[in-house]
């Protein structure tokens, strides 16, 4: 997954690989995709697929006819789009895993039960909650006592790197394969996750302890400071970091953001327009 992300214009914010499934929080890096030159697009695509005879000639530096240029430019536009497509990213990743598993088991046929499921995260609250939900998979499954003891998770990789770093919140001292934590920037669209790495690690550690100790109705008063900045009630936070997938359907974020992003549909039985997922977002993230 991490190696494939280097080829695609997809950033990995969080991941957890379990025994029979995996979770990932992904960021589409449109600026990176648009900034690629034509030859860079072709080179990246050839790391994934064979491309075409014309694209192979182009990469070798051979002269092309005008009709070949027309065809190549059309392919480059399509490949540039695919390099920042989560669908194509997951398609390639699942194909690779299935091929390796089938080779290991010496069999053929379908490896995955169905297509992957995805949800759009619209704001910092939704992002933080989903990342924590993903990173805490092994803790919830009682496979690890703490996030740092878990295997094959982004939080373990980040925590190990942070212990070695002189300044763990500095982007250049964070895990290079993962999307950086950008601190608490004032601008609306920071380059990275809009919080400090150390705050997130503290938040996930605290959340993991609450889950492990099953503290329902007796939440510790020592809540991480970032909880107050995010503006999420502690009980709601603990609930959604254990039930994110079942609680939210589709787009996740503040109610006004969700309403502006997702399409409404007509419910003929109740004769009113409704928006999927609004109730859960209003209850848990307001």
Outline where the language-model segments fall:
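Short catalytic/metal-binding and nucleic-acid-binding patches
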Residues: 1-286
